[in-house]
Amino acid sequence: MSMSSRHLHSSIVNPPPPEYINRKKTGRLTNQLQYLEKVVLKALWRHHFSWPFQQPVDAAKLNLPDYYQIIKNPMDLSTIRKRLEYNYYSKALDCIQDFNTMFTNCYIYNKPGDDIVVMSQELEKVFMEKIAEMPHEEIELSVVGNRGVKSRIKISAVAAEVCKKKMVSQKMHRRTFPCPVIAMMPKRTTLVPLSVIRSSTSSHSASSVSKVNKGIKRKADTTTPAVSLIATSCESSPTLSEPKPNKILSGTEKTRSAETSAVDLPDSQHHIHFIKSNQICEQLKHCNNILNEMMSKKHAEYAWPFYKTVIPTSLLDCSDAIKHPMDLATIRDKMENGLYKDTQDFASDVRLMFMNSYKYNPPDNEVVNMARKMQDVFEGMFAKIPDDPLATQSMVERYKTSTEESSSSSSSEQSSSSDSEDERAQHLALLQEQLRAVQEQLKALTETPIFSKIQPKSAVGVYDKYKQWVKCIEPMGKLLKRKKNYDAKKKKLHVSDEEEDVKPMSYDEKRQLSLDINKLPGEKLGRIVHIIQSREPSLKDSNPNEIEIDFETLKQSTLRHLEKYVMVCLRKRPKKPSSIKSLKSKEQLNKEKKQELEKRLRDVSGQLSSAKKPKIQGFLYPMQSIGGPSRLSESSTSSSASDVSNSSDSSSSDSSDSESATFPKNILAKKQTSTNYEVPLLLYYGCFVNKPRTSIPQNGLCIGSQSLAYTTISTIVHPTPMALMPLHPGSTNYTSLQLLLKYGLHVPLIIENPLGNSVLFENYLEVLHPSQIEQTFAIKEECLKPKYKNAKVKTSFCWEVFSKSLATTHVTIKSSSNSFQQFRKAAIAKEERERALKAQELRRLEDSKAGMQEKLSPSLPMETKVHEMQAQTIDEATKGEPTCNPVHEGITEEERNLARMREQERRRREAMAGTIDMYLQSDIMATFEEHLC
């Protein structure tokens, strides 16, 4: 610390603390002061945020040289405590003012965001909650000797003033203070106005009777014609002639005195008085119920700032800005004293209270939001009040008099009726203009509040005009509101009828709608969002740039509207309900299977190219159909291609058979001879489809409406002196070819040879009888069988057999079943022997190749070697299998699967024999260490 700061610190002098002894001897002890000492001060002192306020501010210690220059009236909790102990205060309002001074000093000297300000706000919140529970009437207490405290009733004008001006809300005073929820005021009993006394000429002492709440005694309001019974001391006002002022009349005495005073009145005054009082009482009962509802605990969260009158001393500019203050307590007093003539006077005071809040506070203030909520509650309840019977009766009387006058002559009747209609139209137009003008002015006042200290004259003028017009506008507003409610109900009924007529959308339709929406271009999606937001109220306020839609939550009418729009955008025809939806739903799955097959075949061909001498190159061309896209071709492609992909995994080699066997027979039954289709497919022996050389013009296939065509088989055979190796393991089964021949599909087949020699011939087979298809398949199987004996391929047999098949396709084959079965068994046995020899040779070659690779690449990771050995094991096991034929009488399918699994396990054990499982070793070590611990 520098010398200057030390000198400044030493030069700060604290002023003497505030005095706590009343030298004028005007101090008293009342029930409210006792409550402030024992309840309010005790609660504040025990609060964990009260420590900065318990002692006077030490400016020298805190190095605050300007504190006492800014704060002219310092105050703290210890000073208030001493003043309460020494009976410094003459009334509770002075003590409350000291508490407010302490909080105000904190807000003046410190910044709004400081910690001390937050602590002060919390203390003030507790203070206001305790003040709300303080007794309403201030009663002086006196101490007599050592016997204790005796209370005697002594109500003065000052005590009554304290009851009226007691502060409840600090939210209206400081805008940064958080909103506390304050307990409600006790419910008061309504005071009955003594209107009889107005008309009578008797003295005030003869009829000064009214209802008084038990335990609560009020001072009479001099501005009110009603007279209240006041309990005073011996020094009370001499105008009352009662000998015992503290005596309260019983209920029978009250009614008896009221009856005697009423008997003296004339009959005409009786009649007029009772009619008016009954009619006004019925209307004001509803207003009183509205007031009780607004002051109930239900609305206390946002109604508490309007309970009591704002103290002008706490807000210096409040009296300048608000010329006509109003609050719920004042409205209640006026209601109890019978100052409201009708419902419109009551409504104008309530609306004035809200207008004052809008004028003084900024629009973003929390008090303004509370006022709006409270006004919504009031307007909703006030609109339910039935019409004034006096007004309706006067209108009926006017109508009767006008009709009586108009009935004097026919000519005058016609003119008066036309005049009355014109007057009604003019009056209605005038009312509408006035209503529009008042609404605009009220809107302008609520949106742009007045912050200046001086209230403009225009605002006062608007308020006066508003009070003048409100009686005329009210019936019109009710009519407009009823019409609006009727239109809303009618519209709601119309929408509900529309919802009932719409057919519910199934799950498949919703899924197809989602797929179609995803196909739409970007510029069409904006319309989709607009349709959903316009028809769904819950999504109306959502962000149109990013919206998440759940079809299960949308209305059926919205879904159908979206379906129509999507069909128009995609130019689709509405589909008839049929079983074809299942095929279309597999369209995406088939494309995914196709891509996965391409990837797998590339990987397998790359891995096996180094281990096999004979090489076969296959290419998978894009699937095309001349007449347009065909789902049948795609599904057939996926089913036949799945044979090759699934055969790579020995455990799932039969899944493709089941998938291919589910080909729809009901579609095949509807074949026609008018159109032909070429279906490119993944085929037998690992060869791939190629585009057919000859193209036949044809129409697109419409599933469900058009039939399938006759298919053709276009085969290209290359005589190969070397062994034809399958590109994928397990592709030697004839399941795919059997199904293709069975269903008559077009099969372009390519078998390439390194020598480059190729022979092309095409054969267009018609759909045959199943017996003809089986015999043709047996012949083709023998023709397509690979041979390894010589360097030359004997193709003469294939040519002869194929020429015979061409010649016999249109002729019924009448061969005996025995000769066919013998021929078939001989062909299968021969093929099995050849494959066994092939498997042995390939196994020896692969074993030698694997040994060479292990010697050349010792650094190869062991896991990759294991995977290669497993792949080779699967290849050899599947190559050595016989064809899956239901007619075969040899080894059954279960035995083959068991042998395959044994061979896989043996190969896996051989591959894992030279490896060490480090994970197992680490687990063993971890278990050992755990047991040691």
Swiss-Prot record:
Testis-specific chromatin protein that specifically binds histone H4 acetylated at 'Lys-5' and 'Lys-8' (H4K5ac and H4K8ac, respectively) and plays a key role in spermatogenesis. Required in late pachytene spermatocytes: plays a role in meiotic and post-meiotic cells by binding to acetylated histones at the promoter of specific meiotic and post-meiotic genes, facilitating their activation at the appropriate time. In the post-meiotic phase of spermatogenesis, binds to hyperacetylated histones and participates in their general removal from DNA. The record marks 110, 115 as: Histone H4K5ac binding. PANTHER family: BROMODOMAIN TESTIS-SPECIFIC PROTEIN, FALZ-RELATED BROMODOMAIN-CONTAINING PROTEINS. One of its GO terms (biological process) is regulation of RNA splicing. It holds the Pfam family Bromodomain. Its main location: nucleus. Residues 495-577 form the NET domain. Residues 423-448, 829-917 form a coiled coil. A motif (Nuclear localization signal) lies at residues 214-225. InterPro entries: BRD4_CDT, Bromo_Brdt_I, Bromo_chromatin_reader, Bromodomain, Bromodomain-like_sf, Bromodomain_CS, NET_dom, NET_sf. This is Bromodomain testis-specific protein. Keywords: Activator, Bromodomain, Chromatin regulator, Coiled coil, Differentiation, Meiosis, Nucleus, Repeat, Spermatogenesis, Transcription, Transcription regulation. Gene3D superfamilies: 1.20.1270.220, Bromodomain-like (1.20.920.10). Residues 404-418, 630-660 have a biased composition (Low complexity). Bromo domains mediate interaction with histones that have acetylated lysine residues at specific positions. Bromo domain 1 mediates binding with histone H4 acetylated at 'Lys-5' and 'Lys-8' (H4K5ac and H4K8ac, respectively). The bromo domains also recognize and bind a subset of butyrylated histones: able to bind histone H4 butyrylated at 'Lys-8' (H4K8ac), while it is not able to bind H4 butyrylated at 'Lys-5' (H4K5ac). Residues 1-21, 235-263, 398-425, 576-610, 627-662 are annotated as: Disordered. Belongs to the BET family. It is found in: Nucleus. Residues 28-134, 278-385 form the Bromo domain. One of its GO terms (cellular component) is nucleus. Residues 584-603 have a biased composition (Basic and acidic residues). It comes from the Eukaryota.
